[in-house]
From Swiss-Prot:
Gene3D superfamilies: Chloramphenicol acetyltransferase-like domain (3.30.559.10), Choline/Carnitine o-acyltransferase, domain 2 (3.30.559.70). It is an enzyme of class 2 (transferase). The modification Phosphoserine is found at residues 17, 366. GO terms for molecular function: choline O-acetyltransferase activity. It comes from the Eukaryota. Pfam families: Carn_acyltransf. The gene is CHAT. Residues 1-29, 619-641 are annotated as: Disordered. This is Choline O-acetyltransferase. It comes from Sus scrofa.
C-alpha cells in the first residue's frame, strides 16, 4: 500500500460510529465516462488487438447515452446518498467473504517478528505473557477511544484517516458459510465484553481468563496461567483431536464440518468460547528447520502442515499471535476486518510495549488464587474424524505447493530513490513490472492496494501498475537489439514513474476504476435478469485475474509482512522499503511451471541495478532528477476519455 501512516500526538480518535466521525467525506463515485476510458486504457496493451476491439465495442454500448451504464451509475449515486460507504459491502463480499479458498496462504497474511532467543519454555511463556499484557493495554486504549488518529503520508500527506478498522482488531470473527462467509462483530448489548484469550498448545485449545473478579491479570499471573496450560497440554491421556485443522480447509468444507460439530452441545460451547475471544495465542513447538526469514515466514503462513504447527491455529479469528519455542514469533491475520497498515500499527504498538515492560522481571504471583485455565472439549463423531483427515491432507497440499522466498535488496533503499525526487513506491512498482517482463515477456493485470481511508469507512482500491508507460519502458530496457540511447530510456523511466504516481493519486482520492466497476457490476446483478456483457467479457474477467498481487507494508521496527498469490499462475509481492534496503516477500505456486519465486527475486534485483544505472545519468548532467511530484495532475484530469 503506497500510503504510510503515522499517528501525530494530541489527536484522539473518536468512536467508529458514523455520527461520531463527521469530519471525513463520503467516498465519491467517479464519472462513468472517465472510468470506462481508464479501463480501456489499462487493458488495451494487455490483450490481443482483436479481443480489445470487441471489448471496446462492448464498453461503448454499455456507456452509450441513455444506456445501461448511465442507469446503473444513477443507482450508484443514489446508493452513495443512502449508505455510509457505497462500496464497502460489495468490496468485502467480493474480496473476502465470497471467496471459497482456504484461508492459509490464499487469504491470511502474516507478520513475522524479529527472531527471539528463548533459553527454555519459561522464556517462551514470559514473552507470551508480555504480549498478552500488551494486547490488553492496547485493547483498553481502543475501548476508551484513546488511540490517536492516523494521518496520511506519501502522496497528499497530512489528511486524517478513518479509524473504523482498528475497532475490528479484537472484536471480529469470520464465520464460515456454505456459499458466503459472515464477518461477525462482537458488539452486543446482551453478551458481555470478551474477557478471555484462547491459547493453542499441542493442537489443544484453552480458555485463559484475563479478567478474574473484575481484576485484569498481571503479567506474572498470565505467566502462571500459561505454565498451567503447557502442563495440561502435555498430558497425552487428555489430548483431543486437532479440531483447528477444520478451519484451514476450504470455506464451504469448513461450513459443512461446523454444521456437523454444532449438533453436539459440548462442541457448541467450545466454538462459542473461541468465537467470542479477544484473540488467539499459539504456543508453537519447534519447527525443526533452520530459522531463516523464509522458514519463519512459512511457519506463520501455514504452520508447516498438520505434522508441525498447522493444526495449532484457528484461522477464523482475526488475530493469532504465534510464540514458538524456537523463537519464531509473529501474528497471523484473518484479513477481512482490517488492512495491513492497521495490523502493522497495532503490532508495532505491542512490540514497543513489550520492549518497555520486558525490562521488569516477571515472577509468578497469586498462584493459589487463580482458577486453572479450562481445556475446550470436543465430541468427535466418525464423520468429524473423516473430515479432519481430509482437512489435514489438503493443508499438506497447501504446504507443498507454496514457493516462497524472503529477499533483501541491500544495494540501496528509499533514501537513494527519494534523492531522485520521486516516490519510492512508484519506483519499486516500475521495478516489479520490469522484473515480470524479464521473466515472462509480457505485462499482466497488477494489483497494488491503495488506502482510501481518507473517506468514511474507506478500505482500499487498486492501483493498476501495468501502465502503457511501464510497458514502453520495460520493452526498451529488455530489447538488446535496440540502439536506443540510455538518455531516452531514462525519459521512459520517468514517464513510467510519473504514470504510476498519477494513478496512485487517482486511487487514494477515490477516482480509480476497480471499486467503481465492482459497484456497477453488483447493481447490475440486482436490476438485470442476467449480468450484462460488459461484465462477462473476457477482457473484464482477465482484468480481475491479478497475476501480480503487490502491496507496500512498511514498518519502523524489525518485522515484515507476507502473503500468498491470488491466482494459480500468479505472484504475491509484499515489500518493505527501508532507508538503505528493500525487503521483498515473493510467493508463487510450485504447481505452476511458469513461475519461480527465486527467479522473480533475482529479476527484481537486476531491475533495481539497471534502474540505478539510468538514474546515474541524471546525476551526471544528462538530465534533472526523476522529478514526478510537480507533474502529478489532479485526478479529474487523469485518463479523461
Amino acid at each position: 500500500m503506497p500510503i504510510l501512516e503515522k499517528t501525530p500526538p494530541k489527536m484522539a480518535a473518536k468512536s467508529p460510529s458514523s455520527e461520531e466521525e463527521p469530519g471525513l467525506p463520503k467516498l465519491p463515485v467517479p464519472p462513468l465516462q472517465q472510468t470506462l476510458a481508464t479501463y480501456l486504457r489499462c487493458m488495451q496493451h494487455l490483450v490481443p488487438e482483436e479481443q480489445f476491439r470487441r471489448s471496446q465495442a462492448i464498453v461503448q454500448q454499455f456507456g452509450a447515452p441513455g444506456g445501461l451504464g448511465e442507469t446503473l451509475q444513477q443507482k450508484l449515486l443514489e446508493r452513495q446518498e443512502q449508505t455510509a460507504n457505497w462500496v464497502s459491502e460489495y468490496w468485502l463480499n467480493d474480496m473476502y467473504l465470497n471467496n471459497r479458498l482456504a484461508l492459509p496462504v490464499n487469504s491470511s497474511p502474516a507478520v513475522i517478528f524479529a527472531r527471539q532467543h528463548f533459553q527454555d519454555t519459561n522464556d517462551q511463556l514470559r514473552f507470551a505473557a508480555n504480549l498478552i499484557s500488551g494486547v490488553l493495554s492496547y485493547k483498553a486504549l481502543l475501548d476508551s477511544h484513546s488511540i490517536p488518529i492516523d494521518c496520511a503520508k506519501g502522496q497528499l500527506s497530512g489528511q486524517p484517516l478513518c479509524m473504523k478498522q482498528y475497532y475490528g482488531l479484537f472484536s471480529s470473527y469470520r464465520l464460515p458459510g456454505h456459499t458466503q462467509d459472515t464477518l461477525v462483530a462482537q458488539k452486543s448489548s446482551v453478551m458481555p465484553e470478551p474477557e478471555h484469550v484462547i491459547v493453542a498448545c499441542c493442537n489443544q485449545f484453552f480458555v485463559l481468563d484475563v479478567v478474574i473478579n473484575f481484576r485484569r491479570l498481571s503479567e506474572g499471573d498470565l505467566f502462571t496461567q500459561l505454565r498451567k496450560i503447557v502442563r495440561m497440554a502435555s498430558n497425552e491421556d487428555e489430548r483431543l483431536p486437532p479440531i483447528g485443522l477444520l478451519t484451514s480447509d476450504g470455506r464451504s468444507e469448513w461450513a459443512e464440518a461446523r454444521t456437523v460439530l454444532v449438533k453436539d452441545s459440548t462442541n457448541r460451547d467450545s466454538l462459542d468460547m473461541i468465537e467470542r475471544c479477544i484473540c488467539l495465542v499459539c504456543l508453537d513447538a519447534p519447527g525443526g528447520m533452520e530459522l531463516s526469514d523464509t522458514n519463519r515466514a512459512l511457519q506463520l503462513l501455514h504452520g508447516g502442515g498438520c505434522s508441525k504447527n498447522g493444526a495449532n491455529r484457528w484461522y477464523d479469528k482475526s488475530l493469532q499471535f504465534v510464540v514458538g519455542r524456537d523463537g519464531t514469533c509473529g501474528v497471523v491475520c484473518e484479513h477481512s476486518p482490517f488492512d495491513g497498515i492497521v495490523l502493522v500499527q497495532c503490532t508495532e504498538h505491542l512490540l514497543k510495549h513489550m520492549v518497555k515492560s520486558s525490562k521488569k522481571m516477571v515472577r509468578a504471583d497469586s498462584v493459589s488464587e487463580l482458577p486453572a485455565p479450562r481445556r475446550l472439549r470436543w465430541k468427535c463423531s466418525p464423520e468429524i474424524q473423516g473430515l479432519l483427515a481430509s482437512s489435514a491432507e489438503k493443508l499438506q497440499q497447501i504446504v507443498k505447493n507454496l514457493d516462497f522466498t524472503v529477499y533483501k535488496f541491500d544495494d540501496y533503499g528509499k533514501t537513494f530513490i527519494k534523492q531522485q525526487k520521486c516516490s519510492p513506491d512508484a519506483f519499486i512498482q516500475v521495478a516489479l513490472q520490469l522484473a515480470f517482463y524479464r521473466l515472462h515477456g509480457r505485462l499482466v493485470p497488477t494489483y497494488e492496494s491503495a488506502s482510501i481511508r481518507r473517506f468514511h469507512e474507506g478500505r482500499v482500491d487498486n492501483i493498476r501498475s501495468a501502465t502503457p508507460e511501464a510497458l514502453h519502458f520495460v520493452k526498451a530496457i529488455t530489447d538488446h537489439a535496440s540502439a536506443m540511447p540510455d538518455s531516452e530510456k531514462l525519459l521512459l523511466l520517468k514517464d513510467a514513474i510519473r504514470a504510476q504516481t498519477q494513478y496512485t493519486v487517482m486511487a487514494i482520492t477515490g477516482m480509480a476504476i476497480d471499486n467503481h466497476l465492482l459497484g456497477l457490476r453488483e447493481l447490475a446483478r440486482e436490476v438485470c435478469k442476467e449480468l450484462p456483457e460488459m461484465f462477462t467479457d473476457e477482457t473484464y474477467l482477465m482484468s480481475n485475474r491479478f497475476v501480480l498481487s503487490t502491496s507496500q507494508v512498511p514498518t519502523t521496527m524489525e518485522m515484515f509482512c507476507c502473503y500468498g498469490p491470488v491466482v494459480p499462475n500468479g505472484y504475491g509481492a509484499c515489500y518493505n522499503p527501508q532507508p538503505e534496503s528493500i525487503l521483498f516477500c515473493i510467493s508463487s505456486f510450485h504447481g505452476c511451471k511458469e513461475t519461480s519465486s527465486t527467479k522473480f527475486a533475482k529479476a527484481v534485483e537486476e531491475s533495481f541495478i539497471e534502474m540505478k544505472g539510468l538514474c546515474s545519468l541524471s546525476q551526471s548532467g544528462m538530465g534533472k532528477p526523476l522529478a514526478t511530484k510537480e507533474k502529478v495532475t489532479r485526478p479529474s484530469q487523469v485518463h479523461q476519455p
